From Swiss-Prot:
GO BP annotations, alphabetical order: nucleotide metabolic process
Marked site positions, Important for substrate specificity: R12, T70, Q157
Stretches of the chain forming a coiled coil according to its record: none
Name under which the protein is recorded: dTTP/UTP pyrophosphatase
Subcellular location: Cytoplasm
UniProt KW keywords: Cytoplasm, Hydrolase, Nucleotide metabolism
A GO term for molecular function: UTP diphosphatase activity
Cofactor dependency: a divalent metal cation
EC number from the UniProt entry: 3.6.1.9
One Pfam family linked to the record: Maf
Record family assignment: Belongs to the Maf family. YhdE subfamily.
Length: 197
């Protein structure tokens, strides 16, 4: 039996794991998220790896550590979490009326009962199309405070859903954890994540 550890404080990621019946604990990595990578897929994979490795040091055996990172990209611009309300407004104006990509990288570190380590890192990409946003809609959304801790300054599963006209790819990638891919990747090691209770 493995202890499953989510190396993230994200309420969305916690919700996804709980939703499918996975029993897990949360151990938040406080490391600074700095990378020299420039491609969105490499950024999210490297940051997910850094988070997972940071937390993995605290566990010896029988543990599955899951690190994840999500960013939004549009025309080679990387959009992380907004620094302030003005920054959120800039991001939302940029995404208004266009299709952008959401990248989520995941690293899974598995430490078995003899302390041997297996590791897998992958990423998923989904596309999101946003309707044309008025200035008033942007300001109302920012006033809700919802955008402030979200990559790209929006939550597809929250109030912003009213402005999302199309999604291509996995919805959970956009929320922050591609659960079906995660399940399949861990299954390759002969482990059923849902049965680890």
């Amino acid at each position: 039996m493995y202890q499953i550890v989510l190396a993230s404080g994200s309420p969305r990621r916690k919700e996804i794991l709980s939703q499918v019946g996975i029993n897990f604990t949360v151990c938040v990595s406080n490391m600074e998220e700095i990378t020299s990578e420039t491609l969105p897929e490499n950024i999210v994979m490297e940051l997910s790896k850094m988070k997972a490795h940071d937390i993995a040091k605290q566990y010896e055996t029988n543990t599955i550590i899951i690190g994840s990172d999500t960013i939004v990209a549009y025309k080679n611009q990387i959009l992380g979490k907004p620094k302030n309300e003005d920054h959120a407004k800039e991001m939302l104006q940029l995404l208004s009326g266009v299709t952008h990509e959401v990248y989520t990288g995941v690293t899974v570190i598995i430490k078995n009962d003899s302390g041997e380590v297996e590791e897998r890192t992958f990423f998923e990409i989904s596309k999101v199309t946003v309707s044309d946003l008025t200035e008033e809609e942007i300001m109302d959304y920012i006033k809700s405070k919802e955008p402030m801790d979200k990559a790209g300054a929006y939550a597809v599963q929250g109030r912003f859903a009213a402005h999302v006209t199309r999604i291509e790819g996995d919805y959970y990638t956009i929320v922050g954890l591609p659960i079906a891919r995660l399940y399949q990747e861990v299954k390759k090691f002969g482990i059923d994540l849902v049965k680890q209770m």
